[in-house]
Amino acid sequence: MNIKVISYFAIITFSFVLFFLIQGYGSLKKFSFQDDYSAFLASDKPHDLQIDFKYLNASELMLSGKRFFYDEKFKLAIKSFNFLIDKHPDLIDSSVHSFLAESYYELQGKFSSDVTNHIEKALYLNPSDTRALSLQGLNYFQQNNFEEALKSWSIALENSTNNKEKESLIIAMNLALKKLKN
């Protein structure tokens, strides 16, 4: 063999070993997870909850739940968040429950017991969770309880850091005020 070929092979091998020492196997798993998720979304097969979440760690479960949520695949988001709650109960924060509540609401189109239970759990863990407060306000608004809706939305507005969310809350609050005056 040529000395150049041997040196190229040694450089590539050394780079590969160095990558594993610095980045570890976990980074390859992340790439694999992202590739699998992209392939899953691109496939023509119906997404009938045949994903196996047991090989994902807590952060990957949270990421997959959020990605499914934002891709409007609410059944998969619900499955992902529920699996996260079952397997990692000590790592659950209010955002998991508020995403679950909104996923159930989007899927069912109403404030079922699933939605209200997860809103309550989210607000128990974090009384200023803006997603949960926004949903709670919407629930009160649909029940024509405009004063309570305004209370929930005003707390959400105080705690929100997202300008689009603030604009939506202000619009909702103005509508509730108009309904309250009538």
Give the location of each predicted region.
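Alpha-helical segment of the N-proximal tetratricopeptide repeat
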Residues: D35-K87
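Start-of-helix register in tetratricopeptide repeats
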Residues: S59, D93-S95, R131, E165-S168
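Alpha-helical adaptor scaffolds
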Residues: R67-Y70, N82-L125, R131
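Register position in tetratricopeptide repeats
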Residues: Y70, E106-Q108, Q142, L175-K179
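TPR-repeat structural position
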Residues: F74, K110-S112, F146
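Canonical tetratricopeptide repeat
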Residues: F99, L135, S168-A172
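TPR/TPR-like (Sel1-like) alpha-helical repeat modules
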Residues: F141, F146-K164, I171-N174
